[in-house]
């Protein structure tokens, strides 16, 4: 790689670190091409990506913004999993690491915070952004539905009473 290509790669990584909800740093030593393709497919289904990065370029892209702890993540053969949703990449990477011994989660970055392996595992247990939005909408709609039911109940009872009087008068 010449200097211009390295600078372009650093700028691309800066964009990844800035635009991603969370970045999961992994070691992939020993994975076959088929296993990497399978992992990339699983990540893509969740809207995430996997990118093999050169450690020195990743450290320069971070530019000391997360300190020594962030630089320490980038040792050995490293791939980063990232997505706009902070949870999806962590979920897939953590699950894949459980299923495959050759793939390990080293840690992660979330904004300016460095996560260790346990932090990424904890992040993976959280519901995704879409699931949280669904729960919030459900919570907001539930009271309105109950209020509508309560308001309709007296009107229904009144209509039944009037119907009963009408039937009684007709008989």
From Swiss-Prot:
Function: Forms part of the ribosomal stalk, playing a central role in the interaction of the ribosome with GTP-bound translation factors.
GO biological process: translation
Protein name in the entry: Large ribosomal subunit protein uL10
One Pfam entry name: Ribosomal_L10
Subunit (UniProt): Part of the ribosomal stalk of the 50S ribosomal subunit. The N-terminus interacts with L11 and the large rRNA to form the base of the stalk. The C-terminus forms an elongated spine to which L12 dimers bind in a sequential fashion forming a multimeric L10(L12)X complex.
HAMAP family: Ribosomal_uL10
Gene Ontology CC entries for this record: large ribosomal subunit
InterPro entries: Ribosomal_uL10 (IPR001790), Ribosomal_uL10-like_sf (IPR043141), Ribosomal_uL10_bac (IPR022973), Ribosomal_uL10_bac_type (IPR047865), Ribosomal_uL10_CS_bac (IPR002363)
Family per record: Belongs to the universal ribosomal protein uL10 family.
Matches recorded under PROSITE patterns: RIBOSOMAL_L10
PANTHER family per UniProt: 39S RIBOSOMAL PROTEIN L10, MITOCHONDRIAL
CDD domains tied to this protein: Ribosomal_L10 (cd05797)
Gene3D superfamilies: 3.30.70.1730, 6.10.250.290
GO MF entry, a single one: structural constituent of ribosome
Keywords for the protein's UniProt record, in alphabetical order: Ribonucleoprotein, Ribosomal protein, RNA-binding, rRNA-binding
Organism annotation: Phenylobacterium zucineum (strain HLK1)
NCBIfam families reported in the protein's UniProt record: PRK00099.1-1
């Amino acid at each position: 790689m010449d200097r211009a290509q390295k600078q372009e790669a650093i700028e691309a990584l800066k964009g990844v670190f800035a635009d991603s909800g969370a970045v999961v740093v992994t070691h992939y030593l020993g994975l076959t091409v088929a296993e990497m393709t399978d992992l990339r497919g699983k990540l893509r289904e969740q809207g995430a990506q996997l990118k093999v990065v050169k450690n020195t370029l990743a450290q320069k892209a971070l530019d000391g913004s997360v300190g020594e702890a962030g630089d320490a993540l980038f040792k050995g053969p490293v791939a980063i999993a990232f997505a706009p949703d902070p949870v999806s990449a962590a979920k897939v990477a953590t699950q894949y690491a459980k299923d495959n011994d050759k793939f390990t989660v080293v840690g992660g970055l979330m904004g300016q915070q460095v996560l260790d392996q346990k932090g990424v595992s904890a992040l993976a247990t959280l519901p995704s952004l879409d699931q949280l939005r669904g729960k919030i909408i459900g919570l907001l709609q539930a009271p309105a539905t109950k209020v509508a039911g309560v308001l309709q109940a007296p009107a229904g009872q009144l209509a039944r009473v009037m119907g009963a009087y009408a039937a009684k008068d007709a008989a």
